[in-house]
Regions:
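AlphaC helix of the protein kinase catalytic domain
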Residues: 138-147
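Residue-level preference for alpha-helix termini and adjacent loops
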Residues: 3, 10-11, 113, 132, ...
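Conserved ATP-binding subdomain of kinase catalytic cores across diverse folds
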Residues: 28-139
């Protein structure tokens, strides 16, 4: 992935957003996991180890989505490794397919920042920040309501 700057071990930010993230205080893993500015996108069926926030930046002006993964059950991690045939963080399970689709010209949210930390063989925590696709809506907003 081009145009990313490593600002800490395992923590990368797109070069266009480095100053903006520093102004927001998003310049360390601890800061990313403590960040609460923006709109909390919690929902009932979201796994307990996932947290999502939508926030905006001014320079460049953009709407961003922060997905954080922490305290991931070991069984979930092992299943991901088996399915992907390699040790992979939960964040990378989001990042890698999106980047492959982008290479084929399919419009996916642009990755702005990402990071992962390991504790021994298992993932400690990871995150990904993506940019909202202009004029897009989430699938949940377009699906019929299930009235069971």
């Amino acid at each position: 992935m081009d145009n990313f700057i490593k600002i800490n071990p395992g923590f990368f930010i797109h070069c266009d957003f480095v100053d903006s993230f520093k102004n927001l205080g998003l310049d360390s893993f601890d800061a990313v996991f403590a960040f609460e500015k923006g709109k909390n996108l919690a929902k009932a069926n979201l796994a307990s180890f996932r947290r999502r926030i939508m926030f905006e930046t001014e320079n460049p002006k953009s709407a961003l989505f922060l997905k954080r993964y922490q305290d991931i059950p070991k069984i979930t991690q092992i299943k991901n490794w088996i399915n992907r045939k390699k040790r992979i963080s939960v964040m990378a399970c989001d990042l890698e397919p999106a980047e492959i689709l982008r290479r084929y010209g399919i419009d996916t949210p642009r990755t702005i920042a990402f990071g992962q930390q390991w504790k021994g063989v298992f993932e400690k925590r990871s995150f990904i920040i993506t940019e909202k696709i202009p004029d897009s809506l989430s699938l949940e907003q377009n699906l019929p309501i299930d009235k069971k």
